[in-house]
């Protein structure tokens, strides 16, 4: 913003006129010289001296020239002695050629602290132009603190419009005031409520309803009937969307756990605006396990109409749907029980201490534990010594259900968990009802005393072999091998019959496979095959490390262990030398 020095300011230092462009200020023949002489009726001003280092022309100021003082436009000139006559050579100096008229503005001149930018065009002292009005006061708020700022701005705009040339401007060096502060926008981008109601949501709701196309918010007289804590929730004849109940109201009757649903149906004189009524059903809780409602006034049909029923369209003009003006009809007190009661009800549902008596067969069906039923002939002749499977619990007493088939035996049956079966009836089946604070829900049986000793090993050998399972494992064992060795002293069993037959040759000593070269007999064909390789010299198995070949795979495996030991010793040796940290190994060396 261009600012001029006002009246009463101290006399500035002789200004240095910097050439911006075109004819220099003060040069003979310039437009400023001609217009100034015509306006004041005086001769042209003396040419101001220039600093040698400010212009690349290298011109030196004249010794007799005196720098004129700064004069505002319209200010009467003080009486002064006539300027000294200039030499004829200087007065008749021709106009500078167009090639030498170039801009002399340097970027370093902007960094000078005492440089004041002034837009002075060639018509600085000319009369103000009639076409351009004066600058309004609101357009120059930053220059009001400076004397004569408004006049200067008006002069600057008028002179610029009169001359039409914005190229000529100069810097006036000297003590200059601090530049005016920059303009800043102090507006607000948020919505301010009425000072009397700083947190009134009506203004925001009216704004949003205008955007979303909803009905306007009711007046403050309708909201006056509500409590102060209910202010964030809409009420009135135009409250189409219900809000959640107040969680922090003084009376806990309006609790956040509605029993069936809550409604907001204030519509007086305008039944067409009462459009929707929310019906929120409680979560899916079995009616048999749900706590009774807090009041008989609750309609069970509407309470359990459906899980979270959607918005239902009400009949327009139906009686009882619309209330009085500004009446916020919440659900009755029975639908909003005390929050403490509701918490107890929820705890009683989620963590029931007592449940209604339900038959045990409902919770535990009869066929729930019929796992791996066995036929009597599956285990052979020694099946009477094997333990039985788990007895499915029945609903009435200790008697077994009809879902499982068990082996007939005079000895007490054992379950897969190592427990006595309920068919033995040695001890009653414990229930949750026998435990204090519980009711008749069937529970797993309590571990009984240790089981009786097992039958003889002979009967067990003729049945299923223990295999990898422990001696106390009585699971159905689908991985058990069905073909056991018939020899009493042998406990081997096999999954395939050919494996059992090959095993029986060990007991009988039968060797049906004979070598044709040496007539040696073998009980297994693979043994004969490897034996023949000793005669033929065939060695199909080679070592991966040293390349040594072997006739049998087990020989190669035994030989590979030698290399593993050598590699371990070599790594220990390299680790002692410090090479192991570099990632070297025996194989790479």
UniProtKB/Swiss-Prot annotation:
One GO cellular component term noted in the UniProt record for this chain: chromatin
Composition skew (Basic residues), residue ranges: 92-101
UniProt-recorded Gene Ontology molecular function terms: DNA-binding transcription activator activity, RNA polymerase II-specific; DNA-binding transcription factor activity; DNA-binding transcription factor activity, RNA polymerase II-specific; RNA polymerase II cis-regulatory region sequence-specific DNA binding; sequence-specific DNA binding; sequence-specific double-stranded DNA binding; zinc ion binding
UniProt keyword list: DNA-binding, Metal-binding, Nucleus, Repeat, Transcription, Transcription regulation, Zinc, Zinc-finger
Induction record: By PHA/PMA or by serum.
Region (Disordered): 29-101, 383-411, 436-466
Source taxon at top rank: Eukaryota
Keyword Transcription regulation: yes
Matching SMART domains: ZnF_C2H2 (SM00355)
Compositional bias per record (Gly residues), positions renumbered to this chain: 395-404
An annotated GO BP: positive regulation of transcription by RNA polymerase II
Alphabetized SUPFAM superfamilies for the sequence: beta-beta-alpha zinc fingers
InterPro entries named in the record: Znf_C2H2_sf, Znf_C2H2_type
Locations listed in the record: Nucleus
Zn-finger (C2H2-type) residues: 483-507, 513-535, 541-563
Gene from which this protein is expressed: EGR4
Entry keyword annotation includes Zinc-finger: yes
Protein name: Early growth response protein 4
First-listed, main subcellular location of the protein, grouped into a coarse class: nucleus
Summary of the function given for this chain in its UniProt record: Transcriptional regulator. Recognizes and binds to the DNA sequence 5'-GCGGGGGCG-3' (GSG). Activates the transcription of target genes whose products are required for mitogenesis and differentiation.
């Amino acid at each position: 913003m261009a600012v001029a020095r006002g009246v009463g300011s101290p006399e500035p230092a002789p200004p240095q006129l910097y050439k911006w462009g075109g004819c220099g200020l003060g040069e003979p023949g310039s437009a400023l010289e001609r217009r100034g002489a015509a306006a004041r009726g005086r001769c042209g001003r003396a040419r101001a001296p220039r600093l040698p280092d400010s212009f690349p022309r290298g011109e030196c100021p004249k010794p007799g020239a005196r720098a004129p003082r700064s004069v505002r436009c319209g200010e009467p000139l003080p009486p002064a002695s006539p300027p000294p006559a200039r030499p004829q050579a200087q007065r008749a100096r021709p106009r500078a050629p167009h090639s030498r008229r170039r801009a002399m503005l340097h970027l370093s001149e902007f960094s000078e602290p005492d440089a004041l930018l002034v837009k002075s065009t060639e018509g600085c002292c000319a009369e103000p132009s009639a076409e351009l009005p004066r600058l309004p006061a609101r357009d120059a708020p930053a220059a009001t603190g400076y004397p004569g700022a408004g006049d200067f701005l008006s002069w600057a705009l008028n002179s610029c419009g009169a001359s039409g040339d914005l190229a000529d401007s100069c810097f006036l060096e000297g003590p200059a005031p601090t530049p005016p502060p920059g303009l800043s926008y102090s507006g607000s981008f948020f919505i301010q409520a009425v000072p009397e109601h700083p947190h009134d949501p009506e203004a925001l709701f009216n704004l949003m309803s205008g955007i979303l196309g909803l009905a306007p918010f009711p007046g403050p007289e309708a909201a006056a009937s509500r409590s102060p804590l209910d202010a964030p929730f809409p009420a009135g004849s135009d409250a189409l969307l219900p809000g959640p109940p107040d969680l922090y109201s003084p009376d806990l009757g309006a609790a956040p756990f509605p029993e069936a649903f809550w409604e907001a149906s204030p519509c007086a004189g305008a039944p067409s605006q009462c459009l929707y009524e929310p019906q929120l059903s409680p979560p899916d809780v079995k009616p048999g396990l749900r706590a009774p409602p807090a009041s008989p006034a609750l309609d069970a049909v509407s309470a359990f109409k459906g899980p979270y029923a959607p918005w239902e369209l009400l009949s327009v003009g139906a009686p009882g749907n619309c209330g009085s003006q500004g009446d916020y009809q919440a659900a009755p007190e029975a639908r909003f029980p005390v929050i403490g009661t509701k918490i107890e009800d929820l705890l009683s549902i989620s963590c029931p201490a007592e449940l209604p008596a339900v038959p045990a067969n409902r919770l535990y069906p009869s066929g729930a534990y019929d796992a791996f039923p066995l036929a009597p002939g599956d285990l052979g002749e020694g099946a009477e010594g094997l333990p039985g499977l788990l007895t499915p619990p029945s609903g009435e007493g200790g008697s077994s259900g009809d879902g499982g088939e068990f082996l007939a035996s005079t000895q007490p049956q054992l379950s897969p968990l190592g427990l006595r079966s309920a068919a033995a009836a040695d001890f009653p089946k414990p229930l949750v009802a026998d435990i204090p604070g519980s009711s008749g829900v069937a529970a797993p049986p309590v571990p009984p005393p240790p089981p009786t000793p097992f039958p003889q090993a002979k009967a067990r050998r003729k049945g299923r072999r223990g295999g990898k399972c422990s001696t106390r494992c009585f699971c159905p064992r689908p991985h058990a091998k069905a073909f056991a060795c018939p020899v009493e002293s042998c406990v081997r069993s096999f999954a395939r019959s050919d494996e059992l037959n090959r095993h029986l040759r060990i007991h009988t000593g039968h060797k049906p496979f004979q070598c044709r070269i040496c007539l040696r007999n073998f009980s297994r064909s693979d043994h004969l095959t490897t034996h023949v390789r000793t005669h033929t010299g065939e060695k199909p198995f080679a070592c991966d490390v040293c390349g040594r070949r072997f006739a049998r795979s087990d020989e190669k495996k035994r030989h590979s262990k030698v290399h593993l030991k050598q590699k371990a010793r070599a790594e220990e040796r390299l680790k002692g030398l410090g090479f192991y940290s570099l990632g070297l190994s025996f194989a790479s060396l």
